[in-house]
């Protein structure tokens, strides 16, 4: 019994360490992408004929990138998602530069899009969307469970198959309701992934993930 307890404690510590390391890597990757993005903007600025202060605009983008990093630095899942979107933007700008399709107004257009997208990342909370989908899913599970309970209240008896379905639904419902997905997605399900089956853990993470993807789409639309 003591051996099992020690093993479980060790496993939990290992998982938490993995989360911390993943968070650190996510920050480093995000910083690297931010640097590439700023460098691309400086190249675009060379083509610009606008009288607007280039350095001021680029400094504004740098401040926004730093603000996003500080805000989501402890949420590697979120930072990785944003990093993917910004990295896509870097690749797009790189192609434009290589193909020499940069126009006189490209710098102003792209800095405007980036300002808008990063502003959304800061001012629109991803947790709002994650929590909304979690709440909707929890209510759906409760509704399904109530149907089985209604059969019992009417004096009926569930079949073996129905009993199994109810048990699975009940377990998933508990995981979804208890998991603090809105507090950090991957980080929030660490302990539950240790104590319940992997499939249930993935279900709970996926439910929050739907809301997260919608949030990323809102930012992506601003950047494009």
Swiss-Prot record:
<feature type="transmembrane region" description="Helical">
    <location>
        <begin position="200"/>
        <end position="220"/>
    </location>
</feature>
<dbReference type="GO" id="GO:0016020">
    <property type="term" value="C:membrane"/>
</dbReference>
<protein>
    <recommendedName>
        <fullName>Outer spore wall protein 6</fullName>
    </recommendedName>
</protein>
<feature type="signal peptide">
    <location>
        <begin position="1"/>
        <end position="26"/>
    </location>
</feature>
<keyword id="KW-0325">Glycoprotein</keyword>
<dbReference type="GO" id="GO:0030476">
    <property type="term" value="P:ascospore wall assembly"/>
</dbReference>
<feature type="transmembrane region" description="Helical">
    <location>
        <begin position="175"/>
        <end position="195"/>
    </location>
</feature>
<dbReference type="GO" id="GO:0000324">
    <property type="term" value="C:fungal-type vacuole"/>
</dbReference>
<keyword id="KW-0732">Signal</keyword>
<comment type="similarity">
    <text>Belongs to the OSW4/6 family.</text>
</comment>
<feature type="topological domain" description="Cytoplasmic">
    <location>
        <begin position="196"/>
        <end position="199"/>
    </location>
</feature>
<keyword id="KW-0749">Sporulation</keyword>
<keyword id="KW-0812">Transmembrane</keyword>
<feature type="glycosylation site" description="N-linked (GlcNAc...) asparagine">
    <location>
        <position position="104"/>
    </location>
</feature>
<feature type="glycosylation site" description="N-linked (GlcNAc...) asparagine">
    <location>
        <position position="74"/>
    </location>
</feature>
<keyword id="KW-0472">Membrane</keyword>
<keyword id="KW-1133">Transmembrane helix</keyword>
<feature type="topological domain" description="Extracellular">
    <location>
        <begin position="221"/>
        <end position="224"/>
    </location>
</feature>
<comment type="function">
    <text>Involved in spore wall assembly.</text>
</comment>
<feature type="topological domain" description="Extracellular">
    <location>
        <begin position="27"/>
        <end position="174"/>
    </location>
</feature>
